[in-house]
A protein has these predicted regions:
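Hydrophobic residues in beta-strands of the RecA-like P-loop NTPase core, especially within AAA+ ATPase
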Residues: 157-158, 192, 227
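Flexible beta-alpha connector loops of hexameric P-loop NTPases
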Residues: 21-25, 67, 129-131, 161-171, ...
Length: 332
């Protein structure tokens, strides 16, 4: 029977969905690079199959040889061009990150399995209108917005691409520029759909990808677990989750991004996490650098101060991200 429909393997299907969701030139280029890289790996197999049909395996220089070389050359040329474009994208992103280092705001990144509700949470916290739908890979391109915590601490919240189990290698390589935004965050909020029947498996899949990126619970960047969609749980399951979160050694925040439940707790937890991670350091600052002195008083806590004739000796407490920003100011 002729069904007249496209047949795709898992990787091709994921790439096709990514292609349908891409909304920026960068996203389109990243998907195209992944598709071509995967297509190139399949060229030899497809042409070998054709040779078998034609009975051409018994001699060199079969009918498919010239065509496969031409196909490979065209694909390689396009891949080379795309890599150059995306290399420039990564360079631009690096410049933007360096610029943000001078802005005294920690970066909080939302990570999680696809369709876990990250964009809905992002919109609920920032009042933005980022595209969010009940579908796979609704977000491909990182989006950032400013947000003020209850203490008055300002942060930058970043919404990122959703993960999936056994994410194809081609996609990880192609989306390197996007994934780098995750590695530069000060805190990761791991959002997962607690109502999903495979919630624990999805959680493990995300942690595995983060681990491959060098981000673990033992790393400098803390990972806070945010269990979303508690509004979809029945009373018994909700009680179970509440008991489990209260007994856990690690901080677990239960929320409903859709209804707003638990968002105040999430924000206050971020406040606490940022404050407890502050580092103490000593610096000598010349009186001529009054702007940096004002910046320190605005961003950190001055524990001890001793004024000299030409400089001031300070013992201060700063968030790790602000320590890096202060070092950039002092070295610029």
């Amino acid at each position: 029977t002729d069904w007249k429909c496209k047949v795709l393997d898992r990787t091709s299907l994921i790439i096709e969905i990514f292609g349908a969701r891409a909304r920026t030139k960068e996203g389109v280029f990243q998907v195209e690079l992944a598709a071509l890289t995967y297509q190139r790996s399949r060229l030899v197999r497809s042409w070998t199959h054709l040779e078998r049909q034609r009975g051409g395996l018994g001699f060199m220089g079969g009918p498919g040889e010239t065509q496969i070389e031409a196909d490979r050359r065209l694909i390689n040329e396009r891949i080379s061009k795309l890599k150059k474009v995306l290399k420039e994208v990564r360079r631009t992103r690096a410049l933007h990150r360096n610029a943000r280092q001078r802005i005294p705001y920690p970066i909080i990144a939302l990570v999680g399995y696809t369709n876990s509700g990250k964009s809905t949470l992002f919109n609920a916290l920032t009042g933005s209108n980022v595209y969010s739908q009940d579908q796979l890979f609704a977000t491909l391109d990182p989006t950032m917005r400013g947000l003020e915590l209850p203490s008055g601490q300002k942060i930058i919240l970043s919404d990122t691409v959703g993960f999936i189990s056994e994410l194809p290698h081609e996609l990880i390589e192609s989306f390197q520029a996007t994934l780098e935004e995750v590695t530069e965050a000060d805190i990761l909020l791991h959002v997962h759909d607690i109502s999903h029947p495979n919630a624990e498996t999805q959680k493990s899949d995300v942690l595995l990808v983060l681990n491959k990126m060098g981000l673990t619970d033992d790393a400098d960047v803390p990972i806070l677990e945010v269990r979303n969609k508690i509004d979809c749980l029945d009373t018994e399951e909700r009680e179970f989750q509440l008991n489990q979160s209260s007994r856990s050694e690690k901080k677990i925040i239960l929320i409903s991004a859709k209804d707003g439940e638990g968002l105040k707790t999430l924000l206050s937890t971020l406040d606490t996490e940022l404050n407890t991670r502050n580092k103490v350091m000593k610096i000598k600052l010349p009186w001529t650098d009054s702007k940096t002195l004002a910046w320190i008083y605005k961003r950190g806590q001055v524990i001890k101060r001793r004024d000299g004739n030409e400089s001031v000796d300070l013992t201060i407490k700063l968030h790790p991200s602000d320590v890096a920003r202060l070092e950039n100011r002092l070295n610029s």
